[in-house]
């Protein structure tokens, strides 16, 4: 998508605000800054928040500081051995399943790291990785939040994103048939807590 064309179209039509929808522009801090620089209202997270949350290492650190539960992680082979197998090697930048490798035994770890780093560098220009314990039969649940310029934040429930191919979402469902009201509220409150940080 051409961000310049979007800003030009907004100005030509007299739009006062830009909502990026979903996908690449919604996760692009430079585009958010450009919208604001052009005296338009950006409907979405601040450029700073986009940048921090787009970096899984920084996002995880912020979540931990906010008291949001996270999986233990390691940044190198030596520390990864303490997590137990299976492991998941993950790219710190990007998404869409790129730079992720499941590791079932110690002999697979070094090659998985090399491979994940190579894919991450090629796809995102950033070869940083981290390692977590791989949780089998896990659910990929995303909490939707909405906030205003006055600091009010609410959660809108969750999206079930567990139907995947190669760690890429195929379909999303809301509400999740696997999340009960108590868990939904706990996860929503954790998301709000993180957003307020």
PLM features: what roles do these ranges have?
Residues 1-197:
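N-terminal beta-alpha lobe that positions the nucleotide/phosphoryl donor
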């Amino acid at each position: 998508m051409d961000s310049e064309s979007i800003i030009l179209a907004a100005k030509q039509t007299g739009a006062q605000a830009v909502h990026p929808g979903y996908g690449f522009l919604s996760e692009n801090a430079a585009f958010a800054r450009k919208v604001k620089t052009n005296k338009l209202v950006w409907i979405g997270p601040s450029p700073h928040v986009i940048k921090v949350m787009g970096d899984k290492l920084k996002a995880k650190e912020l979540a931990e500081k906010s008291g949001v539960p996270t999986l233990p992680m390691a940044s190198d082979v030596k520390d990864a051995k303490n997590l137990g197998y299976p492991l998941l090697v993950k790219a710190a930048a990007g998404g869409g399943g790129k730079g992720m490798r499941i590791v079932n035994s110690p002999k697979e770890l070094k090659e998985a790291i090399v491979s994940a780093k190579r894919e991450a560098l090629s796809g995102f220009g950033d070869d940083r990785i981290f390692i977590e314990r791989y949780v089998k039969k896990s659910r990929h649940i995303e909490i939707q939040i909405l906030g205003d310029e006055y600091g009010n934040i609410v959660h809108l429930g969750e999206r079930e994103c567990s139907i995947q191919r190669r760690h890429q979402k195929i379909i999303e469902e809301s509400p999740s048939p696997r999340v009960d009201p108590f868990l939904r509220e706990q996860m929503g409150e954790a998301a709000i807590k993180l957003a307020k940080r």
